[in-house]
């Protein structure tokens, strides 16, 4: 029997996981929106952020240092990958872009497996968030509330960068017409490298704040990648607000349906995605198709 306490707990679980999915998906949609590249290595970057944070935590014992390492290391990795590999595929067919990012993801996963093995690792939450918080007639894990807050702040910061800064104006202009941006004398290569780094950072940041919730393994990014693509399709490819809306919808679907039968959670998520594709192919808040 489902009680109100159980229902509200699952509702908050959905918000927390939805905010995390929104953060990951925002990185993917920023990369696709500005560069036109569907990054199949995004799940591996999520995983790599978790492991980078794990290394930092083992070295310092500080969760804050782990979070910084998970985010900043992926800025560097993303920028380096864009500069050395990805930029050579912008003019190539989409299937080539998919293959190269898929290959990058496999290389990252296997390098991590070689370095750390396949056994699960964990990063403990900060001491102040290790317990539970009373919330009326239920108690809820404090760290999950922290995840919700951190993800919301990160999404707000990304929104400010995209909609309140010169870089954001250039990125959004590139989403509409990247050729025009180049004609204005802007260093498109540098902007594209920055965009890919920001997108990778969003995945890495999500990876480390998720590490105290779900144990780290080299394959942890696989299911996240699938869910992220579903979120992007539901919200709208290339739409930052759509990534947030899609993430929250997906999080609640996965959480609430698990009360009935966890086996149906993924089925319901894909059913909703199919319904959105039938009724609104561009997604709930999607942009028009790229030319």
Question: Where are the model-predicted features located?
Answer:
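Membrane-interfacial amphipathic/re-entrant helices at transmembrane-helix boundaries
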Residues: 1-23, 52, 63-66, 92-98, ...
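Short, non-helical or kinked segments that cap or interrupt transmembrane helices
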Residues: 19, 26-50, 91-97, 167-170, ...
């Amino acid at each position: 029997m489902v009680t109100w306490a159980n229902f509200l707990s699952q509702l908050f679980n959905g918000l927390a996981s939805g905010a995390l999915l929104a953060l990951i998906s925002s990185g993917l949609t920023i990369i696709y929106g500005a560069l036109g590249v569907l990054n199949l290595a995004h799940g591996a970057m999520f995983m790599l952020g978790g492991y980078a944070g794990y290394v930092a935590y083992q070295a310092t014992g500080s969760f804050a240092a782990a979070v910084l390492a998970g985010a900043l290391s992926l800025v560097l990795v993303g920028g380096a990958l864009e500069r050395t590999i990805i930029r050579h595929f912008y003019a190539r067919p989409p299937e080539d872009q998919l293959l190269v990012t898929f290959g990058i993801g496999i290389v990252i996963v296997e390098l991590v497996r070689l370095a750390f093995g396949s056994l699960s690792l964990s990063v403990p939450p900060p001491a102040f968030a290790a317990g539970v918080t009373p919330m009326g007639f239920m108690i809820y894990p404090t760290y999950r509330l922290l995840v919700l807050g951190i993800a919301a702040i990160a999404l707000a910061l990304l929104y400010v960068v995209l909609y309140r800064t010169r870089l954001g104006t250039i990125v959004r202009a590139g989403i509409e017409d990247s050729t025009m941006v180049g004609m204005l004398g802007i260093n498109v290569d540098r902007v594209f490298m920055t965009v890919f780094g920001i997108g990778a950072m969003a995945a890495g940041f999500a990876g480390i704040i998720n590490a105290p919730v779900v144990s780290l393994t080299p394959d942890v990014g696989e299911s996240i990648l699938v869910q992220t693509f579903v979120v992007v399709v539901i919200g709208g490819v290339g739409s930052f607000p759509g990534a947030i809306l899609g993430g929250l919808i997906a999080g609640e679907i996965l959480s609430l349906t698990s009360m009935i039968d966890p086996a149906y959670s993924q089925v319901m998520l894909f059913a909703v995605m199919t319904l959105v594709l039938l009724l609104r192919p561009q997604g709930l808040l999607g942009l028009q198709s790229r030319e």
